[in-house]
Amino acid sequence: MTKILLTLSLLLSGLVAAQENKYEPVANKAEYYALKYLPGKDYSDLKDWVLENQKKVLSKTDVYDNFEVVLFSPQFGSDLTAHDAVFLGLWPSATEMYKGMGYWIKNGGSQAAKIPVATVQAVDTWQWAISAPEGERDIGAVRFADCKMKEGVNSNQVFDAYKDFAIAAKKTGDNLGRKMIFPGPGATEGDYDYVYSLYARTVEELGSGADNYWQNINGSKEDQALNDLIESCSNYRIS
């Protein structure tokens, strides 16, 4: 059943020995569409279209059984005029994602003609899930940042550090989700290696999670270990 939510070996110097990763990332595919509302349309129209599309197209086949939709509305960012909303489609694999795209191309014409938005950017990504919030999900919130690793550091090392950080954070009451997102075709070019996603099952929990970080996690050994691998994170935005 499609879910709709409102609201991505190191060689040792001189030794040439392989270093095993502490954790094995589980990758999934995700498609991000930045949208502008057509004249006279708003978020309610987009939400209604998504629900209607589920009923009239997606539910008619098992191709979308593992497909999940998330809608974002930008709240904080450097340019809130760039787009009005983001449609995120989550898939377990590239095979399922492109099978879904193929079905939509062949069978989604009538629904596509009624879409209340124009797409201004479409990005194909891979995502590594680090942690996920527990409990029933409501209207949530997500913070994105473009991050660059220090020279000589690879993504698996950063993932290991994020996992250790998330495990330690949970012991302090943290209930936030985290992902490393690797943008592909359609991505905005820039000096970054991945996009970091920090998300909460409710808007309020993103705020309480931030307070918990500064009170209980900042400066911990896991926090320092993570910072030792990351050169910088920038272009923070919240939806």
Role assignments for model-derived ranges:
Residues 18-239:
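Short S/T/G/P-rich N-terminal loop/turn motif that feeds into the first structured element of a domain
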